Amino acid sequence: MANLRPTRTFTRAPRIALRGTVPAAIQLENGRQFTVRLHQLSVTGGLLELATYIDERSRIMMGFAFGSMNVHANAELLFPMRGGLGYMQPFRFTGFGAGVRQTLEIEITKMLQQMMTAARRQRLSDRSPRFFLDSV
């Protein structure tokens, strides 16, 4: 009889696609500062759009406005990828101020719910009549 190991199920943190609409400021350990754009965001990390890539494993401090809050956090940059007009570089959060992570999670959830509601309304308004007499 085969030994069955218990399988672990990992639930990914909800993430929101921002598509570069949220600007962010980052500061490297050496004090250099850059303005970047957020493309994806979750409570564990996200994806930045940069003009030039930054070395993998660089530690940064970042700040950005999201929803009704200003987020200040520490992060570590991951391997950059060539994209569109510059580079896309994933990051993972390594530290938040007190209560920031929970508030960020609430803001992301709120925004996802708003997007789902808007998409549902759009689908209902785009629905064409099933039968000719329904349109009359």
What are these regions (language model features)?
Residues 43, 80-85:
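Short, conserved beta-turn/loop elements at beta-strand boundaries and strand-helix junctions
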Residues 17-23, 53-56, 88-108:
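Short solvent-exposed strand/turn elements
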Residues 6, 58-61, 74-76:
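Short structured motifs
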Residues 65-69:
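Short, charged beta-turn/beta-strand-edge "cap" motif at the junction between a beta-strand
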Residues 36-37, 73-79:
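Short beta-strand-centered aromatic/proline hotspots
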